[in-house]
Amino acid sequence: MSLREVPLRTLSGEPTTLADLVGDRAVLLVNVASKCGLTPQYSGLVELHRSFGPRGFSVVGVPCNQFMGQEPGTAEEIQQFCSTTYGVDFPLLEKTDVNGDQRHALYERLADTPDAEGNAGDIQWNFEKFLIDRDGKVAGRFRPRTTPDAPELIAAIESVL
């Protein structure tokens, strides 16, 4: 099964898949949190979504509360925070475990992807990024401190469009 077909749920709880959510677009999948030192990356993610969207690209946010409880809100609180604070207009999924015994099936597969240094395994922190091409293959893994405007991330996005 392609990553694009793994069953997911939207932030409002509706069943979906990446294919249903964003069509045949390339996707930057990011585990997000509202109360993290890296939360300002939302601004850059919004900019990526808007800049590359017309070329067949979408950011998809995956709220996660596994890292020091930094995404404690309800779905409504998360949506409100994202839209009013950062103007988030990209899709958000339901709060999801990215590590551990309850790790979502999507992240079970993503965790095997190595980053640029060849390191695979558990998601390290909030705002870890996975670039998924239009065919549902992982085209890159970017660690949390890689900002949305980092040249290596921009180049990777360009390469899948």
What name fits each language-model region?
Residues 105-108, 112-161:
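Thiol-/selenol-based redox modules, centered on thioredoxin-like
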Residues 56-74, 89-100:
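Thiol-based oxidoreductase modules, predominantly thioredoxin-like and allied folds used
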Residues 24-26, 35, 39-62, 83-86:
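Conserved helix-turn-beta segment immediately C-terminal to the redox Cys motif
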Residues 40-43, 72-73, 104-105, 152:
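Generic recognition of short, well-ordered alpha-helical segments
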Residues 6-26, 47-52:
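A short beta-strand-turn-helix
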Residues 76-125:
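Short, internal strand/loop/helix patches
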